[in-house]
Amino acid sequence: MVNDLAHRHSLSGVGGRASVGEEKMILGSDHGIWDWANEDDGFCPIDWTKSQSVFTFLKACDGVWDTPYYAESIAMARAAGKLAAPYVWLYNVDPRMQADFWYLRLADEPLIVIDFESYGNSIPDYDDLYNAIERLRELGYTGKIIVYTGHWYWLAHGNTADYWKQFPVWLARYSSAPPQPTPTFAKEIIWQFSASGNPANYGITNGKLAVDEDWFYGTQEQLEELFGGGAVPPIDPPPKPQHKIVIKIRS
């Protein structure tokens, strides 16, 4: 747990677990290339044995581009006993093609997070997210899908259709207060509460100055079930990309 975290967030607990009133929370983190690459794009592996996170999400794909060293990073996280799953960044460029790209790499994963937010000139809308999800299902993906977004972004670019109620939501709010209710989702299951975690508490070795931190609401058993019940899917080398779109990489 980050130094003085209990004080800053009115939480109590140790060993990656806390509580707010009767609600149990488990500490996690999320990471992208900037957490495991150096200035020369070389691999600086996260030392997962020093990470206080119980679970972690790692960026696998940036639209239709592979994240360098993702396969190595998630394998190392799992070998260290972390519950680990991929997330993918959605752009407002041909969501079905992006889903094709993700499926080729992540079809065996029991859980995928789709990152639904803006970056630069890319401002995906709910129809981009819908088409990406439906294409994954059309291709045969049967695992869980979590939507990552922010309250205000969803109000501006999501909608309140009942369709979205089937998906767990992971909400970002860098605050001591949990995210606001975000229709039409039920309460978030994961809260990204900070982007300023101490790198030393998460095994960062490349000199990065801050880490994204998350709380999962629930028990260890519920967390393990979310991540596939302990199943470890195979990690194969990514296939050669069949399409190319010029997109800046975002961690």
Predicted features and spans:
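Aromatic side chains
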Residues: 70, 87-89, 148, 174, ...
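Catalytic domains of cell-wall/extracellular-matrix polysaccharide-remodeling enzymes
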Residues: 110-184
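Universal eukaryotic N-terminal targeting presequences
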Residues: 1, 250-251
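Flexible, glycine-rich phosphate/dinucleotide-binding loops
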Residues: 65, 93, 154, 178, ...
